[in-house]
Amino acid sequence: MVNQSSTPGFLLLGFSEHPGLERTLFVVVLTSYLLTLVGNTLIILLSALDPKLHSPMYFFLSNLSFLDLCFTTSCVPQMLVNLWGPKKTISFLDCSVQIFIFLSLGTTECILLTVMAFDRYVAVCQPLHYATIIHPRLCWQLASVAWVIGLVESVVQTPSTLHLPFCPDRQVDDFVCEVPALIRLSCEDTSYNEIQVAVASVFILVVPLSLILVSYGAITWAVLRINSAKGRRKAFGTCSSHLTVVTLFYSSVIAVYLQPKNPYAQERGKFFGLFYAVGTPSLNPLIYTLRNKEVTRAFRRLLGKEMGLTQS
């Protein structure tokens, strides 16, 4: 095994062969990051400060917003430095931290999105028992389970990836330190790591996504049985935002972690990795707020209070 502590780190290639594209991506990534900071911070503040948003749905949403803030902050600053300047290296320690955070928070988001689907299932299919089933204690327990599973997954998979003997050039064909990219960088047999990724993908991607699809199948069946068109629109409206987020997140993560072994898929995987690391966290607040009248009204109430305090 190579002594990784004595190595200078890795070279993140990204799109270094296209300098013009890197400048464009710098603007896109910076804009997305600023939107992520503002949008997700606003959702957390509204969920905490507005009593009308003190419900399980917004508790889970604020968890998702906090998770997205941490997720993007773990990689975007380094990514911006690499996109803007000639220096595209990352130290072994920074790469290790980045992988650990990526795995932990990515896994947590997979589980949390499943929990949110369960919350919507109970709200639509068992409305009379919703308050009894989804009580505050259960909310905290489910959120804690999501975070713990993410931590355990990262503790298990990060060391086995970082202890691989890497090729001397240490050129990572990606924007960030991702597990698939580092496995491809190894000069020796990586069958164990590939099996580990495949097994983890089943439990973290396939199983949660299947549960989400089952939940939304039951939700769709229940909504179609509602007699009034207004009731159907309201029920679908509360679930469409979450389903959109699930589609964007899972499609991009699956494209990165379950991609076939060919150069085209790997090149495409870089774009998908960039999208789920930067794009989805910036879009989530917009998706959840644009069609959500409760959040819009909460923002107006908060803005009205601030205006009143300023005038007084």
Curated annotation (Swiss-Prot):
One of its GO terms (cellular component) is plasma membrane. Glycans are attached at N3. GO terms for molecular function: G protein-coupled receptor activity; olfactory receptor activity. The keyword tRNA-binding does not apply. GO terms for biological process: defense response; detection of chemical stimulus involved in sensory perception of smell; mating. Its main location: membrane. It comes from the Eukaryota. Residues 48-55, 119-137, 218-234, 291-312 are cytoplasmic. It is found in: Cell membrane. It is a multi-pass membrane protein. Keywords: Cell membrane, Disulfide bond, G-protein coupled receptor, Glycoprotein, Membrane, Olfaction, Receptor, Sensory transduction, Transducer, Transmembrane, Transmembrane helix. Gene3D superfamilies: Rhodopsin 7-helix transmembrane proteins (1.20.1070.10). Pfam families: 7tm_4. Disulfide bonds join C95-C187. Residues 1-23, 78-98, 157-193, 258-270 are extracellular. Odorant receptor. Belongs to the G-protein coupled receptor 1 family. This is Olfactory receptor 2H2. It comes from Homo sapiens.
